[in-house]
Structures are given as structure tokens and as C-alpha cells.
Amino acid sequence: MNKNELELYTFAVPKLELGDMQAGLESFDFIKKFLDKTLLAIDNIKNNLHIFNTLYRGEHINELKDLISIKNTIDKVIEKHEYLDVKNKEVNGVAGLISLTLAAEKLPILLDHVNENTLKVLESSVVLLDKFIADVDFRKSFMKSNDALGSKVWRKNINIETELTSFVDLNLVTDTVKIGQVIPNLYSLKIIHENLVTAGKKTQIFNLKKIEDTIESIVDRVKVIEGMMNNTEDSFTKQAISSVGDSLSDLGNMVRYHSLVYYVTAEVSKVAINIVKTLEKINK
């Protein structure tokens, strides 16, 4: 993993703050610039999903095959080596990996969350945006809803950023990692392997194209809303469009985290694979 590659997945989507929203009520140009910036960020994330989908063709991430292939090697590695003898051995690493054990434990949970919610919320957002465009009364009520595009549903019961940063520092990029820094002992490789295989099976690559297409649908709707913005003097419509912009920020970050969880799963799996393969080659 290199810094440029990681940055594709970690930049934040712009968010419309309350003060900006009030300014936006007074200036169509302000709202349009914000929407353009948000849509550009979302479009960049969509492109990253496409890149990921291209690199990891098939049903799951490519690393799943390698994980399954090393299963029988793990017991041999544990029997062959003492932890104290190999803990300072370096293997190809991941950006700021803090704990391989914790990563393997939490990634299946994070994957369940993004798989269950991302596409569902995006698809429901298309329906809501269609209604926003067609129904004046709905536009008036839209701005009163704190969860207009379903982002709170997606965040329910889990904070993805907190969970990710508990086992990986996304601001630190390294080429290698010491075995002793990421696992407490060699026996932990067995449960790590089991959890990462579970995570690998949860990486539903085939859904990424659906997510891309749904994002494109959202972009199309927002372009229509931009057109509405240029042809109205109605204050309710102005404020409602500001609310759309704010909700789009949440949707953009939702997709960013979805792709980031998939990406981290692949990179963390590589570390486990590299540890086992490296130790297999070392003579005791």
C-alpha cells in the first residue's frame, strides 16, 4: 500500500455547515458551488469503487483465495517457530496497522454493516430525490427532517471511522511491519485466519457495480435539482436544496467508508498471508 493509493479512499466529502447553509439561503451561486463540489467528491469516490471493482474481479477479494490456501501451513509455522525468535521479523505491511488480531475481529462486523446498509440507503435516496423533484409539499417538509436521505439509518449502532481507527492509523503509511507489532503470539494466527476468511467471504464485489450505478442515478437527480435552483425564487425551495446538499455529504462519506472497509480488508489479509508465507520460508 502506498500513500497515493490510500488517499483515494480517505479524503473527506465536503459538508455544508449551519453557517454556510444560512449563506446559501441568500445566494443560489453559493449553493450551486457547494453542490458541484460535493458531486465532484462523490464522483471521485464512484471512480475509486470502479477501480477497486476492476482490480478485484469476481465474487470476493482476490486475497480470499490466498487465505484459504495457507490454512494448512499455519499449524506448521506455529510448530516450527518460537514467537520471540521471529517477532522482530519484518513483512510487507499495511498503512499504520495497529493490531492484526483486532482488525480480523472487527472487519467481518464492518462488512456486514456496509453490505446491509449502503446500497439500501442509496436506492432509497434515489426515490426520495425523485419525490423531492416532483412534489412541492415534500420539498417543504424535507428541510425539517434530520434524516432526509437515510444517513442516520446507515450509521445506526456503529461508528465506522472509530472502529477502523481502533486497529489501523490511516494517517500513517509504511512499507513493512514487524510481526511483534501486530500479533501477540503465533497461536493467534489461527483465529486471525478464520476471521479474515469470514471477512473475505463478505466482500461482495458484485454489489460494487450496483453501488456505482445508483450513485450515477443520484448525480442525475441532483443535476435536475440544480436546474430547479436556477429557476425559483421560493425561499422554501432554497432552504430545501441546502438540506439536500448537507444530506449528500453524508451519502458521499457513506460510500467512501464502504470502499475503505473493502480496501482495508484486502490489505489486512495481505499482512496475514505475508506473515505465514514469510515464516514458512525461514529455517528454524
Task: Walk through the language-model features, giving the residues of each.
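Leu/Val/Ala/Ile-rich N-terminal alpha-helices, chiefly Sec-type signal peptides and the beginnings
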Residues: M1-L102, K106-I109, V114, T118
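Long, low-complexity or tandemly repetitive, helically biased scaffold regions used
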Residues: K65-K284
